[in-house]
Amino acid sequence: MNDLAYHLNEQICSVNPIVFEMLSSLGKRIYFPSKGILSQSAEAHKLAKNFNATIGTAMEGTTAMNLPCVMDNLPGISPNEALLYAPSYGLKPLRDAWKAKILHDNPSLKDVPFSTPVVTCGLTHALSLVGDLFVDPGDTVLMPDLCWDNYLLNFQDRLQANLEFFPFFDGERMNVKGFEERLMHMLPGEKILAVLNFPNNPTGYTPGEKEGQALADALLAAAERGVRVVALVDDAYFGLFYAQDSMRESLFCKLAGKSRNLLAIKADAATKECYVWGLRVGFLSYSIGGADTADSPLYTALEAKTAGQIRAVISNCSALSQRVVTKALTNEGFYEQRHRCEEIMRTRYDRTRKTLDEHPEYRRFFTAYPFNSGYFMCIRFNDLRADEVRRHLLDKYGAGGIAMGERDFRLAFSSLDEEEIAPLFQTIYQACLDLSV
């Protein structure tokens, strides 16, 4: 093991040795190369006043060499801002701005210590990093049966984890009891990664406050029994809450700093929160009992290991994307502009809900899972196969949706103008009539 990794592990153990036990074998070995090219280049940046031949970038004086045909597309951004490398941790102004946004949107975190977010290349990359750092082959990963298929690709196929599922719904509410029962199977000393995503993809469901607290209580009860709990909160669609009775803050708030046996990880992204899907800017933040300050050596070590894994695989994330998001977050009109987009999304949700309420005849062929948030809703066909309906919709009507499993069909009302929603459902109904003949 590299001495730098050994030092980071010592930092973790000095605060809470249980976190070291939670790490995967790679998570224990990984480190940020703070004494290599990057650190020497950083020293030279500060001290090499005459000549600096350290970093592999092409410069003209103090400006990044550039092609006008590139920079002509980036008015208002300098070549150095757009083209030079970002640190593996991410740009510090962006990390600070995102933490400020987390606190703005989650006021109950005001006095709760958690790490400074590390920048990732989108939400998917954040999930991948969590897997790399905390999951070994055969480890247990718990998630709902209605989940994003990329979870399977990452945790099951890539990392060879043992996936366990609980039924997401119990009638019109989330199946908290089923989640709790799965956790009860874990023995003291065993490790589990629990993945929870609200608003949920594919269903568009966010639990209410009581349900959310019950989920947190179940995780904390497992931690109190001695289970090593890594709770991954996937906040990809955070903020898009349309119903009055759904949680308004991240589940991370109910877990952060609550137990020495529970590491809460918040994975979120500018992707949906800033409406910048292709910029690929995500974040990872950590919190656990025993790390009593935001600059705790434990958080410093976890940030370093995260940055080290980024360095090892992609070196760093796009500086240009990070600059754009930083400028957006620090713009005085950011929250007002975000609210305008949220209200458009709310009207699409309302139209979807109203369309289903006004057409009870649709229930002959399909019913909707509970939904109150996010980008999606999901219907379940009573008898028809989802992929058969999908193909018929495409071939005859030029309409697209996502078949998930045998009966489930995901629809993204986020991508439809309000006036398109009712005709889409009527088209789905007509397709079902066609196939039932």
Write out the residue ranges for each language-model feature.
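Conserved core of the PLP fold type I
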Residues: E81-A231, F238-K258, E419, Q426-Y429
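Conserved glycine-rich beta-strand-loop-beta hairpin in the small C-terminal domain of fold type I
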Residues: A319, T326, R338-R353, F365-R380, ...
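Short beta-strand
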Residues: N50-N52, P87, A267, F366-N372, ...
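N-terminal small-domain helix-loop-helix segment of the aminotransferase-like
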Residues: N2-N9, S14-I18, S25-C121
